[in-house]
Amino acid sequence: MRFQTTAISDYENSSNPSFLKFSAGDTIIVIEVLEDGWCDGICSEKRGWFPTSCIDSSKIQNFFSSFHSSNEKDPNAQCCAPFHVEAHLQDSAWFEKHGVQAINSIPSSEEFLRKNLQNDIHHLVKGILTTAAAVSQSIKKEGTQVIVFGIETVRSMVLSFPLIILSTLDENFLSEVAQVFSSLNLLPELSRMGCTYGELCIRFTKLLKQLANKFLFFFRPDVSFPSYFLGSLIAHEIHFLPWDFNMLCSNSVQSAHTNLQPDITSFVAILSLSHEAYHCTENEFWNLEAQKLTENTTQKVLQLVAEDALEAWKLDILEDIDRCIQCCRRFLSANQRINYSSSENNPFSFTSQDVEALKDELSSNLCDLYLWSIDLEQISPSDCLLDNYSLFVDLLVTLKVSLLRIKSIIVQFSERIVFLSLEYKFLTNIQPELNDAEKSQLDGFDLNKTNWFDSKGLVCYLMKQTSPEPLLIRNLLFSFWSCNGKIEQDGKIKTATLVFIINYLLRTDIDSTFFTTIFLNTYASMISSSDLFSILGAHFRFICSLNFGKISFISHEFYRVSKRFLDILLIWFESYLVEELDNSKSIFFLFKIYKVFEVFVVPHFASAEELLHSLSHLLHHPSTKRSHKMLEGKELSQELEDLSLHNSPDPIIYKDELVLLLPPREIAKQLCILEFQSFSHISRIQFLTKIWDNLNRFSPKEKTSTFYLSNHLVNFVTETIVQEEEPRRRTNVLAYFIQVCDYLRELNNFASLFSIISALNSSPIHRLRKTWANLNSKTLASFELLNNLTEARKNFSNYRDCLENCVLPCVPFLGVYFTDLTFLKTGNKDNFQNMINFDKRTKVTRILNEIKKFQSVGYMFNPINEVQELLNEVISRERNTNNIYQRSLTVEPRESEDQALQRLLIDSGIF
């Protein structure tokens, strides 16, 4: 059950974080009405409980009345799901209508604008449908049955963002929108056909751009668009991307429309390029080419010379050539906005190199055109008067050929970009009909002998299907095209496209355990969780939908592929999901996954119920944190068994001094527990954000203190030493901390070890010559060994060797890891030659695996509460480093030059 309401009074319960907090007038999404007058709901992306007395009770009554009436209309409705997020939802259509409406509600102040936009969109759709019908009629005359059937087929799988309109517009309009997007398939086909690539195609494109602008503004009412953006119907004045391509990737869209973002972004990219391409091809310059350059006869030139109009005509030509060059430059610039290997765009049939080759060819032709235009500019009318007009005519012919070639490249470029983009996103429901000639060509085709990684065999298979499923076509295109990757001799992937990586992930003929770990550790830098699940789920449904009778080897592979699919998802959800389950966005994402598993996966694979139960548990307990638990042992220090800090015999002793009364080994043990507790709760996403800044949105709002003891422990040690007035007592305290370091090294707590050694090497302590001079040789030798271990020389080589050979448990020094990650970020590009740098992610995973290894085994010490509280209190206290240094100068003032010389002479044995 889910509906939206408004708070009528403030509510806050600071004693329990499970309760919701809101103010009067806030919008609340009620998930469930509980017993005893309480509700479970979401407000400001936070979820919790609140009393029903704080909201408008009429909303509850109205909702229940409409809900029960819907039950009466659907007596065969299924029972509610086993968790409260899905309670009382009749079916997925009900959820799409009411759930999306609740999340994406628009404030009343914008209702007028919303209605106007809906009306504009409605009229545009009508105009597009009328134009599409006219285009269809013209195509029928050409006998292209595949296109006719395509435009007349209303797709069942359309872009997901029109579903938002479903909350306010009827189903007939949604069907019309679906038909409009299906008509996008005409663009590449029309560009191939000279007889129909004319006024109808241009009009069709203009209307599509208008519709796209309306949808963009509908989703982004917060963006200030140019004044002409909504009102103008002139294609040349519509810049589909007013400011920047990344405008649609803002946080506001991601927070409210995360599941819609990839579709919208892809659609924007496609329409942006098609806009620039058609803007080029419908430019006035092409009319110039038809009207002026075709009249390049000798008589025409001589006539212009006689009328003294040749110079003006030449200037007009040069001006139009300049406009053409500028227009082509804008088109090339628009193409730069699309990264062919990014997760926001879909795989292409052609490689990125094929597209780049067209760009290079276009650039080369533009350069030639520019040089020839310079030659044309240098020809004067007097040259023609001297019977030298043939050079002028030859240049006109050359320009004409060059312009026709440029136009052909632009059309081909647009066709390739648009068509290849539509393959994966839109080309899902086309069911082509074969003519007799095509059928006869395929009669002798043996599908079982086809190499399935060959595109020709794939096309032959698709053409033989009488009515292929949309999902089947989409996944065949996805699985077997655009799989580009560079594999080293040792079998490791260096660079690859996202398609190649995901296909490799799903392979069952190799041992890809480490590869899976690399991908799941770093997938958030390549693709969103929602997109990844959609792709993996589509693969599974594709395997399930294949006709095993016709494809003999698929039935043999079905269970292996299914098991691989389930294993990946189980590992992903249990250990590698980056989203925190503390907002409505993540909850709805899990809900979507639950429904897919319940409907499509469990019926084919009973073992998937384990994952279904895990998802149900997460939905029941959205505040569950996925973190390692500190292991607890049974060892207890007998030295402190009867120690009671609360009954200290001397109340004058400061708490800092109480620490010095404890045995150094016990202090080291308790520091190990504290340090490991902090270290084990650091999530991998906090390390990944050091490399990919865009992952900061996944980092917990209340971050674990990464350096829980580092700075505080350094200041505590330095202050404790300089607080002692007498040199001998300072020496004893110094020796005490060196002993603690010895035990920390023995227990492999390098984090605390580095902190204390850093404190002993700090200026306030290092300058205390008298204090250091009183240390015995054994303690001093021990310090030298520890100091060499923590030295930064040769990139911490001594420490790295020691860490490699140490036995768990261990708390490493995190500073070295962060340094390594920083070097990886600055020294390795994220993408290389339009492909993902997978080698960079492999190196990152090795670091994360090492950290995870140390996080997996805890210390088998029982924490002593009194000691833990004491250490937490004295270490976490804020200290002023300037005061510490001044105190160091007080206890051991600086030596004068005479005193320093006298000390050196005494130390050398002269006196």
Swiss-Prot record:
Domain N-terminal Ras-GEF: start-end pairs: 489-623
* Source organism superkingdom: Eukaryota
Record-level GO BP terms: conjugation with cellular fusion; positive regulation of pheromone response MAPK cascade; Ras protein signal transduction
Q: Name one GO cellular component term.
A: cytosol
Annotated Ras-GEF domain residues = 663-894
Q: Does the keyword Ion transport apply?
A: no
Q: Does the keyword Ion transport apply?
A: no
Transmembrane residue ranges: none
Please give the InterPro entries that the UniProt record associates with this protein: Ras-like_GEF, Ras-like_Gua-exchang_fac_N, Ras_G-nucl-exch_fac_CS, Ras_GEF_dom_sf, RASGEF_cat_dom, RASGEF_cat_dom_sf, SH3-like_dom_sf, SH3_domain
Q: PROSITE patterns from the entry?
A: RASGEF (PS00720), RASGEF_CAT (PS50009), RASGEF_NTER (PS50212), SH3 (PS50002)
Keywords, A to Z?
Guanine-nucleotide releasing factor, SH3 domain
CDD domains cross-referenced by the UniProt entry? RasGEF (cd00155), REM (cd06224), SH3 (cd00174)
Residue ranges of domain SH3 in the record: 1-60
Q: Which PANTHER family match?
A: CELL DIVISION CONTROL PROTEIN 25, GUANINE NUCLEOTIDE EXCHANGE FACTOR
Per the entry, what this protein does is:
Promotes the exchange of RAS-bound GDP by GTP. This protein is essential for mating.
Protein name stated in the entry: Protein ste6
What is the originating organism of this protein? Answer: Schizosaccharomyces pombe (strain 972 / ATCC 24843) (Fission yeast)
**Gene this chain is encoded by:** ste6
